[in-house]
């Protein structure tokens, strides 16, 4: 598979100002030197706790946040430059599904106009072609035709998210950034929305950057995974690399927090969580610099990278 988007040394800093003259005295390193590659038709998971910088990366990719430095390489060119972004029709090819579907939908517009908006922004087609396209999109996400004349408040959370998905795929994008797309939904509704996303990917060949804190969902949805902590990637690899052979103490910490429905192993799981948490506290100084930032990534295999101490002392899988 060929590359669709390549992030090179991406940095997003927010200045901290203080004093009478409101001078910049420090920076919040929301994203600090991230490298990430997304290939055509694949789903890359970006996971981490709140404040790790994962959503900032997603917003930077679609242009909702401004990067401090680095490169966004799309079709071999740096689309951080606005002129090149427009030439390559980047904003048409890269769309986003938001966490809060209701807030992302204009309450004054009908569903027809909401789905039609990106088509009208990027394509010049006649009314009949537009109408046909919108009805096709509605069928894809499983909503009835009468929904087109209704407004966002008339739908449930799951239906609103499906409307958001229909809007995202309206321009036939190459990549969709999905930022916590199901975190606000009930479990039964989550499954419906996730299955729609997988079906759309299979039918249309769209690549996804799937941003989430829920490792169970990420395991179900993704091919490759990057784990973020404090603005940096601490480990990345295939789904098997991350779930079966985790190497970084933070990755192990996240995995140990996944709830289990097996009540017979509840005591064992709790004991393991406490062990992993203690291991994290004991070894933290070896895996992070004095400012709390992860060390540079080391290549462990063709698909697996982790931010390990010098000498790779933690290359083991005792999770």
Swiss-Prot record:
Name the reaction it catalyses: a [peptide](out) + ATP + H2O = a [peptide](in) + ADP + phosphate + H(+)
Q: Where does the record place the ABC transporter domain? A: 5-255
Q: What broad class of enzyme is this?
A: translocase
For binding ATP, which residues are annotated in this chain's numbering? 48-55
Domain of life (superkingdom): Bacteria
Q: Name one GO cellular component term.
A: plasma membrane
Q: Does the keyword Chloroplast apply?
A: no
Which EC number(s) are documented for this chain? 7.4.2.6
Quaternary state and partners of this protein? Answer: The complex is composed of two ATP-binding proteins (OppD and OppF), two transmembrane proteins (OppB and OppC) and a solute-binding protein (OppA).
Q: Which PANTHER family match?
A: TRANSPORT ATP-BINDING PROTEIN
Q: Which family does it belong to?
A: Belongs to the ABC transporter superfamily.
Protein name, please? Oligopeptide transport ATP-binding protein OppF
Tell me the name of the encoding gene: oppF
